[in-house]
């Protein structure tokens, strides 16, 4: 390969990866059971596992990373479901009023439109967002609680399918900065939070190259 592209013979050539896998590596997650959730328009999960998981009916696939496997899945819940009911200004106003120590008990399944892929695979799956309380703060909190419950169910589903059980969580995406929501999520997940080393995929690519030339981490 070096000869083909006119590179010096002593140049190390290492394999690359996808941007999603690189972002996971950038987080610092390195042990089976380490999970990274991206709270964006949708809810995306990646979990480092000692064994691979392939479940096409849920859109679950696994990438090999060294002697471990990175299993991933995505739910249609997430920021799009929140944005359907609240503007950015309303979210900013309501967030300080959240009370994660007192759950609403409304058991929502927030979706912007019918259809779910993971942890439930049903293209006709209906959102569950009623009854709607008169207080917007309670409604907003119930939506966040619902997304947290879906996240916990999704990691549980990965374990049911053979992946390592979730042991710690790191978070990326716009929702990561919401401290009250983080508290709801940690309560639902039952695992400790870890700070990410970086959210930049380029850092993960550099770490992969570093390991590729013989370094442990």
Give the location of each predicted region.
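Active-site core segments that coordinate phosphate-bearing ligands/cofactors
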Residues: 2-169, 177-217
């Amino acid at each position: 390969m070096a000869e083909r592209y006119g590179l010096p013979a002593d140049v190390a050539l290492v394999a690359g990866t996808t941007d999603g896998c690189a972002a996971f590596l950038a987080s610092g997650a390195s042990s089976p059971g380490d999970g990274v959730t991206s709270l964006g328009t949708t809810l995306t999960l990646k979990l480092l596992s000692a064994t691979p998981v392939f479940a096409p009916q849920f859109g679950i696939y696994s990438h090999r990373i060294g002697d471990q496997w990175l299993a991933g899945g995505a739910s249609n819940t997430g920021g799009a479901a929140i944005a359907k009911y609240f503007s950015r200004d309303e979210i900013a106003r309501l967030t300080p009023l959240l009370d994660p120590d007192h759950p609403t008990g409304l058991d929502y399944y927030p979706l912007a439109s019918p259809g779910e892929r993971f942890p439930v695979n049903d293209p006709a799956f209906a959102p569950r967002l009623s009854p709607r309380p008169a207080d917007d703060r309670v409604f907003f909190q119930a939506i966040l609680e619902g997304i947290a419950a879906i996240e916990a169910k999704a990691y549980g589903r990965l374990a049911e399918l053979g992946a390592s059980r979730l042991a710690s969580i790191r978070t990326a995406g716009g929702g990561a900065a919401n401290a009250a929501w983080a508290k709801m999520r940690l309560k639902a997940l039952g695992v400790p939070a870890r700070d990410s080393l970086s959210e930049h995929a380029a850092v993960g690519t550099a770490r992969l190259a570093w390991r590729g030339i013989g370094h442990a981490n």
